[in-house]
Amino acid sequence: MTVQYPTIADCVGNTPLVRLQRLPGETSNTLLVKLEGNNPAGSVKDRPALSMITRAELRGDIRPGDTLIEATSGNTGIALAMAAAIKGYKMILIMPDNSTAERKAAMTAYGAELILVSKEEGMEGARDLADKLQREGRGKVLDQFANGDNPEAHYHSTGPEIWQQTGGSITHFVSSMGTTGTIMGVSRYLKEQNPAVQIVGLQPMEGSAIPGIRRWPQEYLPKIYDASRVDRVVDMHQDEAEDIMRRLAREEGIFCGVSSGGAVAAMLRLSRELENAVLVAIICDRGDRYLSSGVYDPR
């Protein structure tokens, strides 16, 4: 029987879980990566983007034809632009101007209006401008950083998928932290199944810049973040994240972004401390969004 989907939105989720073959080396551990770049708009953010819009509709907060606003470093914006196109919303996205050309082009390809702030203003400036536009009546901010529908998407989809795909054998979960929606939702689900599962978050070390994740100043810390749901936070240098990202492509055939390289680098570090463990890391997007930045240039 031919499988048909009503819309592209119905293709979000149920992404593959793949075992790493070469990077782990000799080990008794099983190292797995979840390929979120296989989602229609190319990242893990497809899940919360649809969740935030759909649940807001169900509450009566928005309806097709409205204008939605969001500050983004890239992936959420692309996912929201796709979701808005499917559901009939106007989308205003605000992002730092040092984001890659591929991300900007993807957003406008879906029909979103793109507003750039300076790299000095960064994501903090983008978030402030989004709030300002909402106060001025330009539209409604979805606010992925404070919106409970963000982690709920992962509680109801990503977490259960990982549990099912590992047959409940997962011992460690590793995820980069930006809005923290992925790690919050997955942690809640996995800990309900087995409180012994260890949740490991990744953030850039001081002075490092890894696209899509941040060391947030206290006043901008995502409101959805609950530190008690994370057992360990790993600080990662961008050089290590980029090195593992390139090795994933060349040794495993997995073409991903820098924060995904960081998550796998953290998983590899962790694996060296363990025996007979089952580790899962999130590959949150695809590498084609980073080509213009030069991170994949021959070295």
Curated annotation (Swiss-Prot):
PROSITE patterns: CYS_SYNTHASE. InterPro entries: Cys_synth, Cys_Synth/Cystath_Beta-Synth, CysM, P-phosphate_BS, TrpB-like_PALP, TrpB-like_PALP_sf. Transmembrane segments: none annotated. GO terms for cellular component: cytoplasm. Gene3D superfamilies: 3.40.50.1100. One of its GO terms (biological process) is cysteine biosynthetic process from serine. It is an enzyme of class 2 (transferase). One of its GO terms (molecular function) is cysteine synthase activity. It catalyses: O-acetyl-L-serine + hydrogen sulfide = L-cysteine + acetate. It comes from the Bacteria. Pyridoxal 5'-phosphate binds at residues 75, 178-182, 259. Its cofactor is pyridoxal 5'-phosphate. Its EC number is 2.5.1.47. CDD domains: CBS_like. This is Cysteine synthase B. It comes from Pseudomonas aeruginosa (strain ATCC 15692 / DSM 22644 / CIP 104116 / JCM 14847 / LMG 12228 / 1C / PRS 101 / PAO1).
